[in-house]
Amino acid sequence: MTDVPSKPPQTTPPPKPKSRAPTTIFSSPPQLPDRSSLNISHTASTPTLTPTPLQQQQIHTDGNSQQPKSSPPPLPERQSFSNSPNRQTQSFIQKPALPPRDSQYNTISGSTVFKSNNNINNNNNDSHIITNGNASTSFIQGNRVTRVLNTNKSEPILQQPQQSHSPQQQQQQHTPNHQQPLSPQQQKDLAQKRSTMPLPPRPNKNRPLPTPISPESHPLTINEENSITEDKEQQPQQSAPPQPQLQQSQQNTDNSRKPIVAPPTPTIQ
């Protein structure tokens, strides 16, 4: 028997390592720069940071290429709203400037507004607006607005007709009989009457309410009850004729819608 040579075991070749970017391994965590090294400008604009040379190298270098990148352009500075010169252009609604006010009158859209404190109604809150035929509702100052549409026509103020009477006649007309001046003797008599008249009783809040009267203690109620009971007992003993009661019940049904009630049967003794 011939010996068969044994084949050596096939060994798989090791896989080729893939090409990787060079990795930077930090032995210790990176230290942050101090606040004193950062130049921060305390203004309304965005703060501009000036990095240190070590930071600059880490920012501008990439893993694949060692060439520094171009830095981004700086942002424009922001203007605060209070310091901006064109503040009216930035607002949405531009209000027109009012004409200058005078101390005596105001001219607003062709209408003259007079401020007067001594009005007919003696109301300081009134403002009189005089327009030339234009019904304009413009509240300038106060609560009430008086519009004079036609300045050519002026209505006269209504005055009461003067009565040609002597002062004695006026006094007799206006003063009634009980308000006429009294003589000194009448005044003394009236004072004596008032002193002798008894005063009306004053209401006492602390006085208790009167107790209700029981029917047993009052004799009138007992007599009334006895008289009523006697009448009730005497009614069935009297034999009343039934015919007039029937006529009354029929008349009642004609006038009002009440049911016909049968007459009571007389008790036979």
Swiss-Prot record:
It comes from the Eukaryota. Residues 1-16, 198-213 have a biased composition (Pro residues). Residues 46-58, 159-181 have a biased composition (Low complexity). Residues 21-45, 80-93, 182-195 have a biased composition (Polar residues). Disulfide bonds: none annotated. Residues 1-110, 157-269 are annotated as: Disordered. This is Putative uncharacterized protein DDB_G0282269. It comes from Dictyostelium discoideum.
